[in-house]
A protein has these predicted regions:
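Active-site and adjacent substrate-binding regions of carbohydrate-active enzymes
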Residues: 1-169
Length: 169
């Protein structure tokens, strides 16, 4: 819900929604298009069995299914922020005071950093994964492995942001 709220407040996204769907309403927005809450099929669209059926139809049309994976960040209200906060870049109250656009208090009170590209402002609907965390890498690998079971290929969006030298910035 937090990422959805941020998406609904974003004027650029609201304009894009209106251009694509002139009669859209806030209820049509499932979440932020930039912030992954879960790598599961949205229940509004079906379930994993429906995804398999869709993939079979795509194959019958002579094409393959490519799914997206984002190793750099997740939705700011992703369940891991509560169950595995050590998988994210953390801060403290002083960090929020110094850089309020970079840090936020997550559910449960942990202070976490928003996702970002080091050359641009933080994305305020996301949380930054700590790619140096062994637990984060293991959890991401499991998500990627599971996604790959349903796809003919996986596109890794923002993959350059998890390179050691880029991430260190």
């Amino acid at each position: 819900e937090a990422s959805k709220s941020r998406a609904l407040m974003n004027e650029g996204l609201r304009k894009a929604y209106t251009e694509a769907l002139p009669d859209w309403s806030p209820e049509d927005v499932a979440g932020s298009p930039y912030a992954v809450y879960s790598y599961r099929v949205d229940p509004h669209l079906g379930d994993e069995e429906d995804l398999v059926q869709a993939r079979n139809m795509i194959h019958e049309a002579g094409m393959g299914l490519i799914l997206d994976f984002v190793p750099n960040h997740l939705a700011m209200d992703h369940p891991w922020t509560v169950s595995m906060p050590e998988c994210f870049i953390r801060g403290d109250r002083e960090a929020i005071r110094r850089e309020p656009s970079l840090f936020f208090p997550a559910e449960g009170g942990t202070i976490l950093a928003h996702g970002r590209d080091p050359y641009f402002p933080p994305w305020n609907d996301t949380v930054q994964i700590n790619i140096f965390s062994d637990r984060a890498r293991a959890a991401l690998f499991e998500e990627l492995r599971r996604i790959a079971e349903y796809a003919d290929g996986v596109r890794c969006d923002m993959a350059m942001l998890v390179l050691n030298d880029t991430f260190a910035r």
